[in-house]
Amino acid sequence: NLVQFSYLIQCANHGKRPTWHYMDYGCYCGAGGSGTPVDELDRCCKIHDDCYDEAGKKGCFPKMSAYDYYCGENGPYCRNIKKKCLRFVCDCDVEAAFCFAKAPYNNANWNIDTKKRCQ
């Protein structure tokens, strides 16, 4: 779910950037999304959005699905999840968290005018 996803982000980036920095970034980080991603981090958000869309097509509820995960020194991972939907959603979130941690953060792409830049 979205709360767990925020913890996974913090785990993957070792607390270097607050989760709220990703809530209004580029064209895809945050609610909705359209156009071409503005950079690598925004592409991570689009991939995560697409993953959640795929989860929805499978009958899952990604924004509300609670799963078991662990935050280790090498980052987050999904723990012993047998239910397919929960595993799928957890994998979406873990992959995105690592993607966020690797991607550079460009302050100029935070809180952009999406009507102009995301067509």
Curated annotation (Swiss-Prot):
Class of enzymatic activity (EC top level): hydrolase
The annotation note on the cofactor reads: Binds 1 Ca(2+) ion.
Report the locations given in the UniProt record: Secreted
Classification via CDD domains: PLA2c
**Enzyme Commission identifier(s):** 3.1.1.4
Molecular-function GO terms, alphabetical? calcium ion binding; calcium-dependent phospholipase A2 activity; phospholipid binding; toxin activity
Q: List the disulfide bonds.
A: C11-C71, C27-C118, C29-C45, C44-C99, C51-C92, C60-C85, C78-C90
GO biological process terms on file: arachidonate secretion; lipid catabolic process; phospholipid metabolic process
Self-association and partners:
Monomer.
Function, as annotated, reads: Snake venom phospholipase A2 (PLA2) that inhibits neuromuscular transmission by blocking acetylcholine release from the nerve termini. Is directly toxic to skeletal muscle upon local application in vivo (dystrophic effect). Also has direct nephrotoxicity in experimental mice; a single subcutaneous dose (1.38 ug/kg) produces renal tubular and glomerular damage within 24 hours. PLA2 catalyzes the calcium-dependent hydrolysis of the 2-acyl groups in 3-sn-phosphoglycerides.
Question: Which family, according to the similarity comment?
Answer: Belongs to the phospholipase A2 family. Group I subfamily. D49 sub-subfamily.
Q: What is this protein called?
A: Basic phospholipase A2 notexin
Q: Where does this protein come from, organism-wise?
A: Notechis scutatus scutatus
